[in-house]
């Protein structure tokens, strides 16, 4: 179903309301400050609980999520109380452990106690919007074993090693490099010749893809499908990808087909028999109105980008294989492996293209609150409760009781498709030998309608003729693989000739954990990366980068919010 929007209204929403001015920049900055503060707060809770031993029992994922969301909500209550109509959470706090990719934010009433162990890598993801202008962030931290005291300070006994360390290094370096490359759009004359051999003086999607792929290859990593570097706009921060086709989509998106193409290109170089590859790129640079992602676009000044890079190392596997995503729900694993991870989706998003006359009073009340408070951004059922945001353990106990009453209304909304659950995904590794030996009589035309996909990316392996349904069936032969994720939001600001990169999230406030990788950048890639990163440090002749700093946290008592 397509929503009817007049062209004049579309121009206002997509163009006029996204032209940077001082008011819009301030809204972005405040959203970035709150997001940075929320991230710092959740990291401090993890450190206090798992590294410093300040709590009697470790915090669970449920407690970390509700405490993080509560902190962000309290900070939002202090800003823009009379000037705007909408503000809130653009991405609920989610805690992704090891192989989990995103949207894992269990409710406080979940019976399972999700905790961490030494050696785990944990990704914290959250987002904030002010009047629809969003700032999202993701950062991966390491859970260390019991530390040692050095100079009266407790420190980790040593760095994290192995494949997890490789993925953290690759994700961090790729994110920092892409931020610097995006900043070159403000001063394209400084673009390194290694990245622009034709001297076009343009920053393109192809350059972004090539540099990220080179960094991943250097660390023996694979870019996880779903990673993207995309432009975001007011109310369009990628929160409804796969549900709503976004007009004028502009960004680089990684999928399984990119791994397939890289493998086939490598095969063509080493063999006289050439395979015919489909060229998905356009013939010239364009900023057309297509909703289908393409690398053939030019990064321009006064645009806002979200850099979301996920890496996983394949060092633990001897054979070549495909990294893909598996969707997890409460039924996963019930008919095969008893110990397999399973959980319910808890993050939802409203679909305004669907209307239905609800029967239950509870459902109508819940829908009204969703439309009023959350609009097009994701939410959790706990966010609709009167006891949210929670400030103490008594609020958490009340919140658990209120969730029971709201679940009946939520079920009708989900059954009538008025809201869609955002799937919890995990990274999986499938050997290519398994893929090549499988029979596929139906060809590549079997599309999994339940799996959200961007337009043009419904078929994961087009050259091998493997459909999404067939790939889903092959997941029973897959192995879980840990991933690291780094996400940051940046503004390429030229308003009033500022020519500066405003980094809303990430940066020095998201310093990588102590890890050590046996890999390093290959010489050609290292030259380009070093050049770009050096420009970000040269304030006079390089790229001017300003980072949003977190707010000062007042004295809270997070221990009082811990459940028994």
Swiss-Prot record:
State whether keyword Metal-binding applies: yes
For this chain's UniProt record, which GO biological process terms are given? proteolysis; ribosomal large subunit export from nucleus
Which GO terms of the cellular component aspect does the record hold? Answer: cytoplasm; nucleolus; nucleoplasm; preribosome, large subunit precursor
As recorded in UniProt, its EC number(s) are 3.-.-.-
UniProt cross-references to InterPro entries, sorted A to Z: Creatinase/aminopeptidase-like (IPR036005), PA2G4/ARX1 (IPR047113), WH-like_DNA-bd_sf (IPR036388), WH_DNA-bd_sf (IPR036390)
- ATP-binding as a keyword of this entry, yes or no, is no
Q: What keywords does the record list, in alphabetical order?
A: Cytoplasm, Hydrolase, Metal-binding, Metalloprotease, Nucleus, Protease
Superkingdom of this entry's organism?
Eukaryota
Q: What class of enzyme is it?
A: hydrolase
One of the record's GO molecular function terms: metallopeptidase activity
Q: Where can this protein be found? A: Cytoplasm; Nucleus
| Subcellular location, principal | cytoplasm
Positions of transmembrane segments: none
Please report which protein family the annotation says this sequence is part of.
Belongs to the peptidase M24 family.
What assembly does the database describe for this protein?
Component of the nucleoplasmic and cytoplasmic pre-60S ribosomal particles.
Q: What does it do?
A: Probable metalloprotease involved in proper assembly of pre-ribosomal particles during the biogenesis of the 60S ribosomal subunit. Accompanies the pre-60S particles to the cytoplasm.
Protein name, entry field: Probable metalloprotease ARX1
**Species per Swiss-Prot/TrEMBL record:** Debaryomyces hansenii (strain ATCC 36239 / CBS 767 / BCRC 21394 / JCM 1990 / NBRC 0083 / IGC 2968)
Gene this chain is encoded by: ARX1
């Amino acid at each position: 179903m397509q929503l009817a929007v007049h062209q004049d209204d579309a121009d206002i929403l997509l163009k006029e309301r996204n032209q940077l001015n001082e008011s819009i920049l301030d809204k972005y900055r405040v959203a970035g400050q709150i997001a940075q503060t929320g991230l710092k707060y959740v990291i401090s809770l993890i450190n206090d609980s798992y590294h410093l031993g300040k709590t009697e029992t470790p915090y669970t994922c449920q407690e970390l999520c509700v405490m993080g969301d509560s902190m962000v909500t309290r900070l939002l209550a202090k800003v823009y109380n009379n000037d705007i109509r909408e503000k809130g959470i653009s991405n609920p706090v989610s805690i992704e452990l090891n192989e989990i990719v995103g949207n894992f934010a269990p409710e406080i009433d979940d019976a399972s106690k999700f905790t961490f162990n030494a050696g785990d890598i944990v990704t914290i993801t959250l987002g904030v919007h002010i009047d629809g202008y969003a700032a999202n962030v993701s950062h991966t931290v390491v859970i260390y074993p019991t530390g040692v005291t050095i100079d009266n300070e407790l420190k980790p006994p040593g760095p994290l090693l192995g494949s997890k360390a490789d993925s953290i290094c690759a994700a961090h370096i790729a994110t920092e490099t892409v931020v610097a490359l995006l900043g070159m759009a403000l001063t394209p004359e400084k673009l390194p010749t290694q990245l622009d051999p034709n001297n076009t003086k343009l920053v393109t999607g192809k350059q972004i893809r090539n540099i990220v792929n080179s960094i991943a290859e250097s660390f023996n990593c694979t870019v996880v499908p779903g990673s993207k570097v995309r432009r975001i706009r007011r109310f369009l921060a990628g929160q409804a990808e796969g549900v709503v086709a976004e007009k004028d989509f502009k960004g680089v998106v990684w999928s399984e087909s990119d791994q397939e193409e890289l493998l086939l290109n490598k095969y063509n170089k080493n063999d006289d028999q050439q395979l015919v590859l489909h060229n998905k790129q356009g013939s010239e640079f364009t900023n057309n109105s297509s909703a289908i992602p393409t690398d053939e676009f030019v990064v321009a000044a006064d645009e806002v980008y979200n850099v979301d890079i996920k890496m996983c190392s394949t060092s633990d596997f001897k054979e070549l294989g495909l990294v893909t995503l598996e969707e997890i729900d409460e039924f996963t694993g019930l008919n095969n492996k008893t110990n397999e991870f399973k959980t319910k989706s808890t993050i939802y998003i409203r679909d305004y293209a669907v209307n239905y006359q609800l029967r239950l009073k509870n459902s109508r009340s819940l829908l009204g609150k969703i439309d009023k408070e959350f609009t097009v951004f994701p939410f959790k059922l706990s966010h609709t409760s009167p006891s949210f945001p929670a400030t103490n353990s008594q609020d958490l106990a009340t919140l658990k009781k209120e969730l029971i009453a709201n679940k009946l209304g939520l079920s009708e909304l989900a059954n009538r498709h008025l809201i869609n659950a955002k799937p919890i995904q995990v990274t999986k590794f499938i050997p290519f030998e398994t893929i090549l030996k499988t029979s596929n009589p139906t060809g590549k035309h079997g599309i999994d309608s339940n799996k959200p996909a961007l337009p043009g990316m419904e078929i994961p392996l087009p050259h091998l003729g493997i459909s999404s349904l067939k790939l889903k069936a092959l997941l029973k032969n897959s192995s879980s693989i840990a991933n690291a994720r780094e996400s940051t939001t940046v503004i390429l600001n030229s308003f009033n000739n500022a020519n500066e990169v405003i980094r809303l999230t990430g940066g020095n406030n998201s310093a990588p954990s102590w890890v050590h990788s046996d890999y390093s950048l290959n010489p050609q890639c290292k030259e380009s990366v070093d050049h770009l990163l050096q420009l970000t440090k040269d304030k006079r002749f390089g790229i001017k980068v300003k980072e949003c700093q977190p707010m000062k946290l007042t004295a809270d008592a997070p221990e009082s919010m811990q459940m028994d």
